């Protein structure tokens, strides 16, 4: 396979993954978007976390909330727990990397808030501890996962929502997570900003 064929292959595999996900994920994406919309209507906030590419996804979601997606609107309260290098490194140094998100949630999370937890494997210890901390604070969890959901799946409660991409490849899962994040942003805009229905 030459490089041109490889690029074409990657496009085709990404399209196949998204196509396979459509019927499986529409319902949980809508449910998650409605849950997030109600959270914001009730003047609560959305915290997000992830590692590596998933950290970038967490920041992507937060930036769309604080700035805007495709509709002019006020800022919505959202915070990516991945962005404060001083806090993350202090917790990792003094305690452990597994606690870099859970300790922030203990200080920042409140009942009625939502945690957007993103993990392609479902096994990242800091994400697992973040979910436990969110439950202690009375928060619901929206989890973006892949593969078999990992240990993360076993921690979710009946009021939590898992959006699991049916793929094994980390790259394909992350590409679909980006689309899911845009779908969530679009739902929130349409639920909270009536004029966005026209676009």
From Swiss-Prot:
Named cofactor requirement(s): Zn(2+)
SUPFAM superfamilies, sorted: SIS domain
One Pfam family hit: SIS_2
Keywords linked to the UniProt accession: Carbohydrate metabolism, Cytoplasm, Isomerase, Metal-binding, Zinc
MF terms (GO), sorted A to Z: carbohydrate derivative binding; D-sedoheptulose 7-phosphate isomerase activity; zinc ion binding
Record localization: Cytoplasm
EC number(s) reported in the record: 5.3.1.28
Top EC class, one word: isomerase
Major location category of this protein: cytoplasm
Catalytic activity: 2 D-sedoheptulose 7-phosphate = D-glycero-alpha-D-manno-heptose 7-phosphate + D-glycero-beta-D-manno-heptose 7-phosphate
GO cellular component: cytoplasm
Gene Ontology biological process terms from the UniProt entry: carbohydrate metabolic process; D-glycero-D-manno-heptose 7-phosphate biosynthetic process
Other known facts: The reaction produces a racemic mixture of D-glycero-alpha-D-manno-heptose 7-phosphate and D-glycero-beta-D-manno-heptose 7-phosphate.
Record-linked NCBIfam families: PRK13936.1
Family: Belongs to the SIS family. GmhA subfamily.
Protein's name according to its UniProt entry: Phosphoheptose isomerase
Organism annotation: Coxiella burnetii (strain RSA 331 / Henzerling II)
Species classification: Bacteria, Pseudomonadati, Pseudomonadota, Gammaproteobacteria, Legionellales
